[in-house]
């Protein structure tokens, strides 16, 4: 999945979260859990966009770490809304699934970035040059 596809996917996730929160009942618990979900769910896309503009591999890893945390947190709040009876499974499960997939993508991106960073440090630049045959 390329950067633009993931930007669109995280945006669609945020829009799904917004629609879900707007559909919640107007009681104290729904408001508190809904606000938490709204914050974490919309943060996934914002932090991913920020990660795509990272200034270094370490900056990218840090920002993708936030994406991972926020996506996982979104699954948590959605699950709480479901088990507390404020959200039907048919609505909650797809959002929890997408949050899990976004979490997995973030984890894989972090692992790849760390591996690439360690490989580039392990190979001296001079070793990258191919000697000319004479």
Language-model-derived ranges and their functions:
Residues 1-134:
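Short, C-terminally biased terminal segments at protein or domain edges
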């Amino acid at each position: 999945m390329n950067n633009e596809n993931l930007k669109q996917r995280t945006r669609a996730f945020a829009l799904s979260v917004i629609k879900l929160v707007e559909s919640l009942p107007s009681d104290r618990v729904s408001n508190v859990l809904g606000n938490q979900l709204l914050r974490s769910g919309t943060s996934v896309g914002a932090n991913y966009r920020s990660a795509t503009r990272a200034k270094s591999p370490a900056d990218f890893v840090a920002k993708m770490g936030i994406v991972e945390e926020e996506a996982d947190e979104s699954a948590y709040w959605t699950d709480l809304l479901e088990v507390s009876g404020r959200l039907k499974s048919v609505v909650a499960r797809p959002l929890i699934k997408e949050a899990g997939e976004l979490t997995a993508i973030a984890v894989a991106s972090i692992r790849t970035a760390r591996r690439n960073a360690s490989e580039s440090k392990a190979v001296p630049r001079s070793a990258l040059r191919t000697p000319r045959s004479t």
